Design a protein with these regions (language model features):
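Short, low-complexity, polar/charged sequence segments that are solvent-exposed and flexible
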Residues: 27-33, 123-126, 161, 227-228
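Conserved non-catalytic scaffold segment of RNase H-like nuclease domains
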Residues: 2-119
């Protein structure tokens, strides 16, 4: 019996925050602030059996893009993203795999992108609170900012999520990114193509980070098994 495919959806979103709403630190974007803008982003639905390796050459060709400048309104952009994710959830159900839900994967998504999407779906009337609860439970999330904690020597006893560039400096050292705040200026200057290219590269790096972390986990588990076998061999 063949194993049903499970989608791992790598994604990255961008926002615009007007000057009067900008904070020095933290997430300045608020999905309920009518002056803020949800710019959209890209999603890459990867097959668990075929795409979770480091041999992908054309990342952009595997991505689905949703950008504000390609839609008449923010509401229609949000609606398009909602139906895209709903379709992925339905595909999982049709595959008959009830134990493994579609996995949403990114860096820092549990405190930013995922809550933002749910609130945008509520704001534009696509979900009420009970339906939002059901919707989010059709998915599972994997935040590399948390998963990567074990891949670093922590200087104290506080296990704290790692920043995007901290993770990328280990797994894609040739590619680092400016703060997401740089996108605000790009949007004001209408440099939309640069924003699009940035997001494609961010998702590519997230995918490479996923593969790199998986390889590290397997390596460490291999060392653990070797140590166990050595202890058993020389146990008196």
């Amino acid at each position: 019996m063949s194993q049903p495919q499970t989608n791992v959806v790598f994604f990255d979103l961008e926002y615009y925050v007007p000057e009067q709403s900008r904070k020095k630190q933290g997430l300045a974007y608020n999905p309920w602030d009518s002056e803020c803008r949800f710019l959209g982003g890209c999603f890459m639905a990867a097959s668990a059996s075929q795409d979770l390796h480091d041999g992908i050459d054309n990342y952009s060709g595997k991505m689905d893009a949703f950008w504000l400048w390609n839609y008449p309104s923010e509401a229609e952009l949000v609606e398009a993203v909602f139906y895209y994710l709903s379709n992925i959830a339905e595909q999982g159900s049709r595959n008959g795999n009830r134990r493994v839900s579609p996995l949403l994967c990114g860096i820092g998504i549990t405190h930013s992108d995922l809550p933002v999407l749910l609130d945008l779906f509520r704001r534009y009337g696509l979900l009420d609170n009970p339906k939002a609860f059901v919707f989010q439970n059709q998915f599972r999330s994997l935040d590399l900012s948390q998963l990567a904690v074990a891949m670093f020597n922590n200087s104290n006893r506080l296990l704290y999520p790692k920043a995007k560039n901290t993770i990328l400096s280990k797994y894609t050292p040739d590619t680092l990114f400016e703060s997401g705040r740089a996108v605000w200026t790009l949007y004001e200057q209408e440099k939309y193509r640069i924003i699009e290219e940035r997001v494609v590269e961010e998702i590519a790096c997230t995918h490479r980070g996923y593969v790199g972390i998986l390889d590290d986990i397997r390596y460490l588990k291999g060392l653990e098994q070797e140590d166990k076998e050595m202890r058993q061999k020389y146990m008196v």
